[in-house]
Amino acid sequence: ASLSGSVSFFAVPAEEYIDADKRARLRKEGIGFPASGKSELIRLGEFDHSDIIMTTHVHMMPVEEDFYLGNAACNGFSAERVTVRGKAAHAAIDPWDGVNALSITSSAIQMMGLMRETFREEDHVRLHNVIRKAGDVINAVPDEAVIETKVRAASLDAIRATQEKMDRAYDGAAYAFGGTIEREPLQGYMPILHRGADKVMEESVKLLDASYRCSKPADFNNACTDVGDLTHLFPVLNFTFGGFAGKLHGADFKIMDEELAYIKPAKLLALTTYRLLCDQAKEAKKICREFKPV
């Protein structure tokens, strides 16, 4: 049967959020890559002629079935590069004349820890700080510290509110010690919007010798992915699959079932595409009509 439509394949770089220093080096080399693969493709306009996006990944949540159909809601995040300015002094002769940037940083991070009781469970807040620099020599009061921060939460409102708390922690610690704070906002990801299993995908998976379950509104993934950016612009038909063992991003990760990890996901993509585009793309057009960009 003829199909009404076309399919584009993207070899997209992994969604992993690379550090600010590496992004700065890439920019100097003329490589855009502001945060991750799909975000960059959006920036370049590569999806401008697309109507529906299909994505797939190994299971990101505990799932016993072979396939998980639909998009569970996921956190989004904001990020900053924070530079703490202090004042250098000899660490033994006159430390009282210095302003310790590392102490400011440590105090701010401790304050964030004490703030955790203010985070609502339904907001799924996660805070991350990585100290990239905290002084240069051991016998001098550190006059500069550089930290990359990340705030994860389930909604933009929760992200903004938590980011304000994090900023106040740094500002308050700097004020207490007599230092200053500089901030560079970094690109983050939008939260993933929940989408249930589309009929075309559920009908397709039934043709495979595989177990499955469909996403529910209560399902939530605390991680973040650049698919979140796509879900605000396009209907994203997603599924995840098993066939592996070990931890995601762990040294023990390995494929255990090549049929389930490679062959069946490819078949599910092909079968779903067929059902979207057959019969004058009836199902694809219905999905597009019902989708409202956010």
Segments the model singles out, each with a brief description of its role:
Residues 3-128, 135-140:
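Histidine/acidic-residue-rich, glycine-tolerant segments that coordinate divalent metal ions
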Residues 106-294:
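Metal-dependent amide/peptide-bond hydrolase catalytic core
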